[in-house]
Amino acid sequence: YDICACLVGSEMCIRDSPTGRLNIQRMERLCKTLSDLKNAGHEIILVSSGAIAMGFGKLNLRERPHDMPTKQASAAVGQCELMYVYDKLFTEYNHTVAQLLITAPDIADGGSRKANFHNTMDRLLELGALPVINENDTVSTEEIAVGDNDTLSAIVAATVSADLLVLLSDIDGLYDGDPRKNPDAKLIPTVETVDERIIALGGGSGSSLGTGGMATKLLAAQIAVGAGCEMVIANGEKPELLYDIVAGKPIGTRFLVKR
């Protein structure tokens, strides 16, 4: 894979507690693994959630905010902290990070904004930088209300013609039933076509820290695969699994591109 995009859900960055504090060990392992993959010749793009969750931790709020102004204030504080952490960790491995905060209209249309984003991304990769992308949560209301870095990451992957998109969250992959209700539900290792039957499996599994569930991940798969980009849904508890995912090994659920 030449260009690999990786989405990190909020639950990857933040400890699953009311405090919204950073999961330092997991973030360190993630950045080390991505740095090593970059050293091995893969272009890496990171789409990272976690600004709101990190912000309410830093603001010492007792729980995730529910009203829009507090969410957006949390995002403003948390985004600084998030980038500080990524900059610090990637710098240890001699990689330079670049922050890109975008909203859906920036990359949704075929106009000059999308072309501008594409050109900037191309140049950053040429210069050897590692782009870290998030929705611009302080001005973007729809994303926070609906919660959709899954779709954002797929649009980014499609825009830059990525070869692989990996969605890391607290979900192991796509199951043929709800594993929380049905212990016999089986993981589906590969999906060749994201059809109505597959979409129907995307009920509504979500995590407490983030805002996206399986339904948005399947929408992301449609966008990515439609643009010729393979996609994998995997559990990010062990970021080192990225080595096996990039090597094509059966981890999580892989959505294949028709060649």
Model-found features: residue ranges?
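Acidic, metal-binding active-site segment of PIN/NYN-like and related structure-specific nucleases
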Residues: A158-D184, E230-L241
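Active-site loop ensemble at the mouth of alpha/beta enzyme cores that anchors a bound cofactor
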Residues: E240-R259
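Short beta-strand segments at enzyme active-site cores
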Residues: E43-G55, A98-Q99, V132-N134, L167-I171, ...
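Single conserved hydrophobic/aromatic residue that forms the stacking wall/gate
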Residues: Y1-G9, I14
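Short catalytic helix/loop segments, enriched in acidic residues and glycine
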Residues: G20-S35
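Ligand-binding beta-strand-loop-alpha-helix segment within the catalytic cores
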Residues: R64-S140
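Glycine-rich loop at the start of a catalytic domain that most often binds anionic cofactors/ligands
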Residues: A51-M68
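Polyanion-binding loop/helix "lid" in catalytic or ligand-binding cores
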Residues: M121, I133-I155, K186-L242
